[in-house]
Amino acid sequence: MFELTGRKALVTGASGAIGGAIARVLHAQGAIVGLHGTQMKNWRHWQLSLETGSSCSRLIWPIETKSRRLVRERKPILKASTSWSTNAGITKDGLFLHMADPDWDIVLEVNLTAMFRLTREITQQMIRRRNGRIINVTSVAGAIGNPGQTNYCASKAGMIGFSKSWRRRSTRNITVNCVAPGFIESAMTDKLNHKQKEKIMVAIPIHRMGTGTEVASAVAYLASDHAAYVTGQTIHVNGGMAMI
Protein backbone atom coordinates (compact mmCIF):
# COMPACT_ATOMS: atom_id res chain seq x y z
CA MET A 1 0.00 0.00 0.00
CA PHE A 2 2.24 2.80 1.32
CA GLU A 3 5.81 2.16 2.43
CA LEU A 4 6.35 3.15 6.07
CA THR A 5 9.28 0.94 7.01
CA GLY A 6 11.26 2.43 9.87
CA ARG A 7 8.74 5.19 10.55
CA LYS A 8 7.58 5.61 14.14
CA ALA A 9 3.91 6.36 14.74
CA LEU A 10 1.83 7.11 17.83
CA VAL A 11 -1.87 6.24 17.64
CA THR A 12 -4.31 7.44 20.30
CA GLY A 13 -7.76 5.95 20.70
CA ALA A 14 -6.26 2.60 19.72
CA SER A 15 -8.81 0.65 21.75
CA GLY A 16 -11.54 1.70 19.31
CA ALA A 17 -12.45 0.19 15.94
CA ILE A 18 -10.89 2.97 13.86
CA GLY A 19 -7.83 3.56 16.03
CA GLY A 20 -7.18 -0.16 16.19
CA ALA A 21 -7.44 -0.51 12.42
CA ILE A 22 -5.04 2.41 11.96
CA ALA A 23 -2.49 0.77 14.26
CA ARG A 24 -2.73 -2.52 12.36
CA VAL A 25 -2.46 -0.93 8.91
CA LEU A 26 0.48 1.30 9.84
CA HIS A 27 2.25 -1.68 11.39
CA ALA A 28 1.54 -3.82 8.31
CA GLN A 29 3.24 -1.16 6.18
CA GLY A 30 6.38 -1.38 8.28
CA ALA A 31 5.87 1.33 10.89
CA ILE A 32 6.86 0.95 14.53
CA VAL A 33 3.65 1.73 16.38
CA GLY A 34 2.97 3.10 19.84
CA LEU A 35 -0.59 2.68 21.11
CA HIS A 36 -2.54 4.81 23.54
CA GLY A 37 -5.88 3.64 24.81
CA THR A 38 -7.98 4.09 27.91
CA GLN A 39 -9.88 0.80 27.58
CA MET A 40 -7.22 -1.60 26.36
CA LYS A 41 -7.95 -4.36 28.89
CA ASN A 42 -7.23 -7.17 26.47
CA TRP A 43 -3.65 -6.19 25.78
CA ARG A 44 -2.72 -9.79 25.02
CA HIS A 45 -5.26 -9.73 22.20
CA TRP A 46 -3.48 -6.70 20.75
CA GLN A 47 -0.14 -8.45 20.85
CA LEU A 48 -1.61 -11.42 19.01
CA SER A 49 -3.51 -9.32 16.47
CA LEU A 50 -0.26 -7.79 15.22
CA GLU A 51 2.41 -9.80 13.48
CA THR A 52 4.96 -11.79 15.44
CA GLY A 53 7.90 -9.63 16.42
CA SER A 54 5.84 -6.46 16.58
CA SER A 55 7.60 -3.41 17.95
CA CYS A 56 4.32 -2.12 19.30
CA SER A 57 4.59 -0.19 22.58
CA ARG A 58 1.94 -0.15 25.28
CA LEU A 59 1.23 3.39 26.44
CA ILE A 60 -1.88 3.60 28.59
CA TRP A 61 -2.41 6.81 30.58
CA PRO A 62 -5.41 9.10 31.03
CA ILE A 63 -5.02 11.23 27.91
CA GLU A 64 -6.67 14.33 29.35
CA THR A 65 -4.32 14.68 32.31
CA LYS A 66 -1.01 13.07 31.33
CA SER A 67 -0.18 14.58 27.93
CA ARG A 68 3.16 16.02 28.98
CA ARG A 69 4.17 12.83 30.74
CA LEU A 70 3.19 10.69 27.77
CA VAL A 71 5.54 12.53 25.44
CA ARG A 72 8.35 13.53 27.76
CA GLU A 73 8.96 10.29 29.63
CA ARG A 74 11.72 8.13 28.33
CA LYS A 75 9.78 6.47 25.57
CA PRO A 76 11.92 6.35 22.41
CA ILE A 77 8.93 5.79 20.13
CA LEU A 78 7.44 9.10 21.24
CA LYS A 79 10.58 11.16 21.06
CA ALA A 80 11.25 9.81 17.58
CA SER A 81 7.68 9.71 16.25
CA THR A 82 7.36 10.87 12.67
CA SER A 83 3.59 10.28 12.48
CA TRP A 84 0.86 11.17 14.95
CA SER A 85 -2.74 10.02 14.59
CA THR A 86 -5.39 11.17 17.07
CA ASN A 87 -8.52 9.04 17.28
CA ALA A 88 -9.64 9.32 20.90
CA GLY A 89 -13.27 10.32 21.04
CA ILE A 90 -16.44 9.95 23.08
CA THR A 91 -20.08 10.97 22.80
CA LYS A 92 -22.56 12.27 25.35
CA ASP A 93 -25.63 12.84 23.22
CA GLY A 94 -28.63 14.90 24.20
CA LEU A 95 -30.91 17.67 23.02
CA PHE A 96 -29.10 21.01 23.00
CA LEU A 97 -31.52 22.77 25.37
CA HIS A 98 -31.28 19.92 27.88
CA MET A 99 -27.55 19.26 27.60
CA ALA A 100 -25.81 19.42 30.97
CA ASP A 101 -22.56 21.33 31.33
CA PRO A 102 -20.59 18.20 32.34
CA ASP A 103 -21.72 16.42 29.16
CA TRP A 104 -20.47 19.34 27.07
CA ASP A 105 -17.24 19.67 29.01
CA ILE A 106 -16.12 16.04 28.93
CA VAL A 107 -16.70 15.64 25.18
CA LEU A 108 -14.74 18.80 24.38
CA GLU A 109 -12.01 17.77 26.85
CA VAL A 110 -11.44 14.30 25.40
CA ASN A 111 -12.12 14.98 21.72
CA LEU A 112 -10.56 18.42 21.30
CA THR A 113 -8.57 19.70 24.27
CA ALA A 114 -6.57 16.50 24.76
CA MET A 115 -5.72 16.52 21.05
CA PHE A 116 -4.49 20.12 21.39
CA ARG A 117 -2.31 19.33 24.40
CA LEU A 118 -0.74 16.22 22.93
CA THR A 119 -0.18 17.77 19.51
CA ARG A 120 1.52 20.75 21.13
CA GLU A 121 3.90 18.43 22.95
CA ILE A 122 4.74 16.02 20.14
CA THR A 123 5.11 18.78 17.55
CA GLN A 124 8.09 20.12 19.48
CA GLN A 125 9.87 16.85 18.72
CA MET A 126 8.89 17.06 15.04
CA ILE A 127 10.14 20.64 14.72
CA ARG A 128 13.55 19.60 16.03
CA ARG A 129 13.72 16.85 13.39
CA ARG A 130 12.19 19.04 10.67
CA ASN A 131 9.82 16.27 9.73
CA GLY A 132 6.40 15.06 10.81
CA ARG A 133 2.93 13.90 9.83
CA ILE A 134 -0.02 14.90 12.00
CA ILE A 135 -3.29 13.18 11.11
CA ASN A 136 -6.40 14.03 13.13
CA VAL A 137 -9.35 11.69 12.76
CA THR A 138 -12.46 13.82 12.97
CA SER A 139 -15.96 12.98 11.68
CA VAL A 140 -18.45 13.80 8.96
CA ALA A 141 -20.54 15.17 11.84
CA GLY A 142 -18.00 17.95 12.25
CA ALA A 143 -18.72 19.08 8.70
CA ILE A 144 -22.49 18.68 8.40
CA GLY A 145 -23.75 18.53 12.00
CA ASN A 146 -26.05 15.97 13.59
CA PRO A 147 -29.16 16.42 15.77
CA GLY A 148 -28.57 15.63 19.42
CA GLN A 149 -24.79 15.84 19.11
CA THR A 150 -24.04 19.53 19.54
CA ASN A 151 -21.06 18.81 21.78
CA TYR A 152 -19.64 16.05 19.57
CA CYS A 153 -20.08 18.02 16.35
CA ALA A 154 -18.48 21.09 17.90
CA SER A 155 -15.48 19.05 19.03
CA LYS A 156 -14.98 17.44 15.62
CA ALA A 157 -15.44 20.72 13.75
CA GLY A 158 -12.92 22.19 16.16
CA MET A 159 -10.39 19.53 15.16
CA ILE A 160 -10.71 20.58 11.53
CA GLY A 161 -10.30 24.27 12.36
CA PHE A 162 -7.36 23.50 14.64
CA SER A 163 -5.63 21.50 11.91
CA LYS A 164 -6.06 24.23 9.30
CA SER A 165 -4.87 26.93 11.66
CA TRP A 166 -1.83 24.96 12.80
CA ARG A 167 -0.93 24.14 9.21
CA ARG A 168 -0.89 27.87 8.39
CA ARG A 169 1.71 28.31 11.08
CA SER A 170 3.74 25.10 11.01
CA THR A 171 6.84 24.76 8.87
CA ARG A 172 9.86 22.49 8.61
CA ASN A 173 8.29 19.71 6.56
CA ILE A 174 5.42 19.04 8.96
CA THR A 175 2.06 18.29 7.36
CA VAL A 176 -1.25 18.52 9.21
CA ASN A 177 -4.36 16.85 7.81
CA CYS A 178 -7.68 15.35 8.87
CA VAL A 179 -9.56 12.20 7.96
CA ALA A 180 -13.33 12.45 8.45
CA PRO A 181 -15.11 9.08 8.60
CA GLY A 182 -18.81 8.65 8.07
CA PHE A 183 -20.66 5.64 9.49
CA ILE A 184 -18.07 2.94 10.18
CA GLU A 185 -18.69 -0.62 11.36
CA SER A 186 -17.91 -0.69 15.08
CA ALA A 187 -19.26 -1.75 18.45
CA MET A 188 -21.21 1.51 18.45
CA THR A 189 -22.98 0.87 15.13
CA ASP A 190 -23.57 -2.78 16.08
CA LYS A 191 -25.99 -1.51 18.72
CA LEU A 192 -28.24 0.08 16.09
CA ASN A 193 -31.43 -1.80 15.28
CA HIS A 194 -32.48 -2.79 11.76
CA LYS A 195 -34.74 0.24 11.29
CA GLN A 196 -31.99 2.64 12.34
CA LYS A 197 -29.51 1.02 9.97
CA GLU A 198 -31.98 1.19 7.08
CA LYS A 199 -32.43 4.92 7.65
CA ILE A 200 -28.66 5.39 7.57
CA MET A 201 -28.24 3.39 4.36
CA VAL A 202 -30.67 5.67 2.54
CA ALA A 203 -28.24 8.55 3.09
CA ILE A 204 -25.20 6.61 1.84
CA PRO A 205 -24.97 6.22 -1.96
CA ILE A 206 -22.72 3.15 -1.61
CA HIS A 207 -25.42 1.59 0.62
CA ARG A 208 -23.15 0.16 3.28
CA MET A 209 -21.11 1.25 6.25
CA GLY A 210 -17.39 1.69 5.91
CA THR A 211 -14.71 -0.33 7.64
CA GLY A 212 -11.96 0.73 9.96
CA THR A 213 -9.43 -0.48 7.41
CA GLU A 214 -10.83 1.90 4.79
CA VAL A 215 -10.32 4.82 7.16
CA ALA A 216 -6.88 3.51 8.10
CA SER A 217 -5.85 3.41 4.44
CA ALA A 218 -6.43 7.16 4.18
CA VAL A 219 -4.33 7.68 7.31
CA ALA A 220 -1.53 5.50 5.91
CA TYR A 221 -1.52 7.60 2.74
CA LEU A 222 -1.21 10.85 4.70
CA ALA A 223 1.58 9.35 6.81
CA SER A 224 3.58 8.34 3.74
CA ASP A 225 5.91 10.21 1.40
CA HIS A 226 3.18 10.06 -1.25
CA ALA A 227 1.34 12.79 0.69
CA ALA A 228 4.34 15.06 1.24
CA TYR A 229 2.61 17.86 -0.71
CA VAL A 230 -0.79 17.36 0.94
CA THR A 231 -1.46 19.51 3.99
CA GLY A 232 -4.31 21.45 5.57
CA GLN A 233 -6.80 19.07 3.97
CA THR A 234 -9.65 16.86 5.14
CA ILE A 235 -10.14 13.51 3.42
CA HIS A 236 -13.75 12.38 3.75
CA VAL A 237 -14.32 8.62 3.98
CA ASN A 238 -18.11 8.37 4.09
CA GLY A 239 -19.37 6.46 1.05
CA GLY A 240 -20.76 9.64 -0.50
CA MET A 241 -22.93 10.52 2.50
CA ALA A 242 -21.52 14.05 2.39
CA MET A 243 -19.87 15.24 -0.83
CA ILE A 244 -17.74 18.12 0.38
Curated annotation (Swiss-Prot):
A Pfam family recorded for this sequence:
adh_short_C2
Residues that bind NAD(+): 11-35
GO molecular function term, any single one: oxidoreductase activity
Any one of the GO BP annotations: lipid metabolic process
Where does the chain bind substrate?
A: S139
Matching SUPFAM superfamilies: NAD(P)-binding Rossmann-fold domains
Lineage at the top is: Bacteria, Pseudomonadati, Pseudomonadota, Alphaproteobacteria, Hyphomicrobiales
The record's function comment reads: Proposed to modify Nod factor fatty acyl chain.
Q: Which family does it belong to?
A: Belongs to the short-chain dehydrogenases/reductases (SDR) family.
The record's annotation in SMART domains points to: PKS_KR
Q: Which InterPro entries match?
A: NAD(P)-bd_dom_sf, Sc_DH/Rdtase_CS, SDR, SDR_fam
Protein's UniProt name: Nodulation protein G
Query: Active-site residues?
Result: Y152
The alphabetical list of record keywords is: NAD, Nodulation, Oxidoreductase, Plasmid
